[in-house]
Regions:
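Membrane-embedded alpha-helical bundles of multi-pass transporters/translocases
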Residues: 1-199
């Protein structure tokens, strides 16, 4: 149950962030070339995190990795919220690296936790249920994405977003709150739930 709750919260935060990202770079940063670079750096960082996960786990322990990863995403969200108005692409990318490093480690840790749940289920019940468990994970991801899509539509309406027009300062600020601050709060909750209840 803890894994399911953690995955739902994590996916919701990611969907809010990624759903607004292109709007943010189009109207907030006003640089789609930087958007492509930012996404590419993020992808490379997440792959690097997956590769480094086993080594980091050996040093700090798997449970601590997840908590540290949540902290990295929160720092990344906070950093992007602060520096996005400074016009400094390097600082923005550095904050993005912190965020994506956390995301990569969380993805790796979640896969390990699910595998452990399968093994534990086999130990306790005498049967492996990986197909059910991994299907449930896929369903959760799709459900979270769909639900966040509704929230994004509502959020755009709430901040008075006007397509293909210059956005007001309040609209840009609202966009940053939805894609950075709300996901940061969700990741704090995710870290607390995991740290307190995952054994």
């Amino acid at each position: 149950i803890v894994i399911i709750v953690s995955v739902i919260i994590f996916q919701a935060s990611q969907a809010l962030y990624s759903g607004f990202l292109v709007y943010f770079f189009t109207y907030g940063i006003k640089d789609l070339n930087l958007y492509a670079t930012f996404v590419a750096i993020g992808t490379v960082t997440q792959v690097a995190a997956l590769i480094l996960f086993p080594r980091i786990s050996k040093v700090v322990g798997r449970k601590n990795v997840y908590t540290i990863a949540c902290i990295l995403t929160v720092l990344g969200f906070g950093g992007m919220f602060i520096v996005s108005g400074m016009g400094n692409s390097i600082l923005l990318c550095l904050a993005g690296i912190a965020y994506n490093l956390g995301v990569g480690l969380i993805n790796a840790a979640t896969t390990v936790m699910i595998s452990n749940a399968v093994d534990y289920g086999e130990y306790k019940l005498g049967k492996r249920s990986e197909s059910i468990i991994f299907s449930a994970q896929t369903f959760i991801v799709k459900f979270s994405t769909a639900f966040s899509g509704l929230i994004i539509g509502f959020g755009l309406s709430l901040i008075k977003y006007v397509p293909n027009a210059t956005q007001t300062a309040s609209t840009i600020f609202g966009m940053k709150v939805i894609m950075f601050l709300i996901p940061a709060v969700l990741m704090v909750i995710c870290a607390v739930v995991y740290s307190k209840y995952y054994k």
